[in-house]
UniProtKB/Swiss-Prot annotation:
Function field: Catalyzes the first glycosylation step in glycosphingolipid biosynthesis, the transfer of glucose to ceramide to produce glucosylceramides (GlcCer). GlcCer are known to contribute to the physical properties and physiological functions of membranes and may regulate signal transduction. Only branched-chain sphingoid bases like 15-methylhexadecasphing-4-enine are used for generating complex sphingolipids in Caenorhabditis elegans.
Organism (species): Caenorhabditis elegans
UniProt cross-references to InterPro entries, sorted A to Z: Ceramide_glucosylTrfase (IPR025993), Nucleotide-diphossugar_trans (IPR029044)
Protein name: Ceramide glucosyltransferase 2
Transferase as UniProt keyword: yes
KO phenotype (gene knockout): Reduced brood size.
Chain's gene name: cgt-2
Keyword annotations of the record: Glycosyltransferase, Lipid biosynthesis, Lipid metabolism, Membrane, Sphingolipid metabolism, Transferase, Transmembrane, Transmembrane helix
Locus of motif D1: 139
């Protein structure tokens, strides 16, 4: 070793033979640690094999069952709390809000069409236009709209016929001419069967402008009070099972919009390619939300539910509609195929009762009874919040139809799974995985 003395400092300069190359140091480290780790590898493999041999798959299933059903309970609580927080809040008029272009795609007429459409002519909003879209000029609904235009001449309204063929989604094709000439910053899509409260457009616009990045506002689907078994059945479905998921999903910022009554910022939608960009999808509402979210925009819900008020509800039409939605979800999100049939009351009751019985030897019948009581109580509370007034039917009728709907739900899923083709209006659609329309056949 050579010493170099500079003033009071002594620097030790190692000889060349003492300086080891970096690669040599790595080799030494490897030779040091490899034997240390290599002796544990057989032990690790042996331990893993023993765990796999000794694992109790029933215990794993039971633990998964408790976690899964607990998540469903959590959604119940979140949906109810968010409904109490968000629904039926008063909205003050605000003349600084931007104008709204309301697009109404219409096919056919029923006994409630005039009443439903009139609520848009009389809406309490300072600046809006009504854009009615018809596939054919001889549609029976044309005369209904013409009579309302004559009754309310001061309302800015326009009718379009024939649509514009830009893709396989007939609703997008029908609305395209109206979208092209819409003159306001906010675009609202509203189905013909929606009954609108006088301040609902105001509320949706206020919600939209409450946050700079808000670009999509929807109304939670519900139903106006109507007579008839099928109408009550539909109302209970939308007031319980559907409302719970919709409210909880929006609270947790899941993408779950429905297009029956929705409002978007035209500028944000144009960034995504406008209506034309979604003409290849049948569930355009879902993909509106997905694309807007991918660009950093937020979505929210109005304080007023969307009041569906079709006069032509039958059990067959309702079943076909729900079945069509199940098929859409299966095509768009195939990962939920195994989860969807288990999320209703009675399938989840069997899961949690088996799980708790296996893990803690808790009586299965007791668990099922407590589960059903919790489920129906929470559903009833959610529906009361959606209704926001006295129910139009008795508690006994609610109980009987609720039970029937819950028993009916697995059968709807089975029907949807057996025939993935989707019949809508006068067309049959076949979807590819991901939700894109693969083919369309007229019937």
């Amino acid at each position: 070793m050579g010493d170099k003395i500079t003033g009071l400092e002594v620097e030790i300069i190692p000889e060349i033979s003492e300086v080891q190359p970096e690669s040599l140091q790595e080799q030494n480290a490897s030779s040091l640690y490899y034997p240390l780790f290599s002796q544990y590898i057989p032990l690790l493999l042996t331990g893993t094999k023993k765990i796999l041999e000794d694992i109790d798959y029933c215990t794993c299933f039971a633990v998964f069952g408790v976690v899964f059903v607990s998540a469903l309970y959590f959604l119940h609580i979140v949906g109810l709390c968010y409904g109490k927080y968000r629904l039926h809040r008063p909205t003050k008029p605000n003349p600084s809000l931007p104008g709204v272009s309301i697009i109404k795609p219409i096919i056919g007429a029923d006994a409630n069409l005039y009443t439903n459409l009139e609520t848009f002519f009389t809406t309490q909003y300072h600046k809006f236009e009504l854009l009615f879209c018809f596939d054919r000029s001889d549609d029976p609904a044309v005369k209904v709209v013409e009579s309302l235009v004559k009754k309310y001449p001061s309302v800015d309204s326009t009718m379009f016929f024939g649509g514009e063929k830009i893709g396989l989604n007939p609703k997008i094709n029908n609305m395209m001419p109206a979208y092209r000439i819409a003159k306001y910053q906010l675009i609202m899509i509203s189905d013909s069967g929606i009954f609108m409260k006088s301040d609902a457009v105001l509320d949706m616009a206020s919600t939209m402008m409450s946050h700079e990045t808000m670009a999509l506002v929807t109304q939670t689907p519900y139903c106006k009070d109507r007579k008839g078994f099928a109408s009550v059945f539909e109302q209970i479905y939308f007031g319980t099972s559907h409302a719970r998921i919709y409210l909880a999903g929006n609270c947790l910022q899941f993408n779950c919009p429905t297009g029956m009554s929705s409002m978007m910022k035209k500028e944000a939608l144009d960034e995504c390619g406008g209506f034309a960009a979604f003409s290849g999808y049948l569930a355009e509402d879902y993909f509106f939300g997905k694309k807007l979210a991918s660009r950093g925009y937020k979505s929210g819900i109005s304080t007023h539910p969307a009041l569906q008020n079709s006069a032509a509800v039958t059990m067959t039409s309702f079943t076909d509609r729900v079945c069509r939605w199940v098929k859409l979800r299966m095509a768009m999100m195939p990962q939920i195929i195994f989860v969807e049939p288990l999320q209703d009351c009675f399938p989840s009751a069997l899961i949690i009762s088996f799980s708790l019985n296996y893990i803690a030897n808790i009586d299965m019948l007791t668990t099922i009874m407590l589960h059903v009581v919790f489920w129906i109580t929470m559903d009833c509370m959610v529906m009361c919040k959606m209704q926001n007034k006295k129910m139009s039917f008795s508690p006994l009728k609610f109980l009987l139809i609720w039970l029937l709907r819950e028993l009916f739900a697995p059968l709807v899923f089975i029907k949807a799974a057996l025939d993935p083709s989707i019949r809508w209006r006068d067309n049959v659609f076949h979807l590819a995985w991901g939700g894109k329309i693969r083919s369309q056949t007229s019937i």
